[in-house]
Curated annotation (Swiss-Prot):
Its main location: cytoplasm. GO terms for biological process: ribosomal small subunit assembly; translation. InterPro entries: Ribosome_maturation_RimP, RimP_C, RimP_C_sf, RimP_N, RimP_N_sf. It is found in: Cytoplasm. PANTHER family: RIBOSOME MATURATION FACTOR RIMP. It comes from Treponema denticola (strain ATCC 35405 / DSM 14222 / CIP 103919 / JCM 8153 / KCTC 15104). Keywords: Cytoplasm, Ribosome biogenesis. One of its GO terms (cellular component) is cytosol. Belongs to the RimP family. This is Ribosome maturation factor RimP.
Amino acid sequence: MEFIQKKDIPYFSECEPLVEGLGFKLVDLNVLHKKDVWQVKAVIKSEKGVGIKDCTSVHRTLQPRIEALIGSQDVTMEVSSPGINRLVKRAVEFYAFVGEEAQIWDNSITDWRHGIIKEVNSEGLVLNSDNQDIQIPYQDIKKARCNL
């Protein structure tokens, strides 16, 4: 799995403070231009969980900002929670799950590791499994699930 800085994800740095101001973490932001329409998908989480009203609130806050950043009002936007057993698509998502349970396929042992994500950095993460801290570099992570 490759690590991409938050600042390198288009519009993430501009949107993250708005989402955090509403009391949520921005897990992922995906902005695609298809034909004449921009498609935006935002994934948010909160310690209390995420409901439809939360998604609506974030949508109403982010939509005008995204439109201004892109320079277009032809934007469709979807805001959702990570859901249960979130399949991690980008290593940067691990930041949102520090302190939570994860299941990680570790290529170095060709098996799943289970534990609590203790620390995340640009090289890898520390997983606490059976009271033992295990350093797992992103290059050894084939896939991962969080929010178990």
